[in-house]
Design a protein with these regions (language model features):
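Short beta-rich binding modules
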Residues: 2-184
């Protein structure tokens, strides 16, 4: 764990960000405020997103704190995010973590979006305990190939308005200096 902060995007969306670092390489995990995209989601869907986000965040916090040490008094995302960031910035950053990092559908590295399975834990586990992090079928460890999006070419107009004049280039001959007759 390197740092954590609360911020707002240029478009006004609220989020908190957690940065992990190992040997100079960083992973930035952004947790966005769950919102109702143009009224497309039900109240239950929003609540499910909030619960999932809370569970994922608790997995991270429990690497540094005992459950009874974590008290949240916030009533909205902004207050929750501030409390999470405060806890993370006060955490012992020398404590090593074992983190499962996967690719999302756009080819970026991220933490898994699920909360049901373990994806982060302390590197040093209590005596007799083994790692709960496992490779799941839903995990993507191979960077997906994302094809370029082709944009259609706009037709300049009716075909009769385009005049095409064939050009004739000087013929290239096969000779000792150019045995294949190539123009280069």
């Amino acid at each position: 764990l390197k740092s954590a902060r609360v911020a707002e995007s240029p478009t006004g969306r609220k989020f908190f960000e957690v940065v992990f670092e190992k040997n100079g390489a960083t992973l930035t995990q952004t947790e966005w405020k769950p919102d109702n995209k143009n009224g497309q989601l039900s109240d239950e869907d929003i609540q499910r997103k909030e619960d999932n986000q809370f569970s994922r965040t608790m997995q991270l916090l429990l690497c540094f704190y005992k459950d009874e040490e974590l008290v949240f008094n916030g009533t909205n995302f902004e207050e929750f995010a501030k409390e999470v960031v405060d806890y993370l910035n006060k955490a012992d950053k020398s404590k090593l973590l074992r983190v499962k990092i996967v690719y999302n559908d756009k080819g970026y590295t991220t933490l898994p979006s699920y909360a049901k399975y373990t994806f982060i834990e302390p590197m040093i586990l209590p005596e007799g305990q083994t790692s709960a992090i496992t490779e799941l079928r839903i995990d993507n460890f191979t960077k997906p190939v994302v094809a370029d999006v082709e944009t259609p070419v706009v037709n300049p107009g009716p075909s009769e308005s385009i005049s095409i004049s064939p050009t004739v280039e000087a013929a290239v001959e096969n000779n000792a200096e150019n045995p294949y007759g190539l123009p280069f």
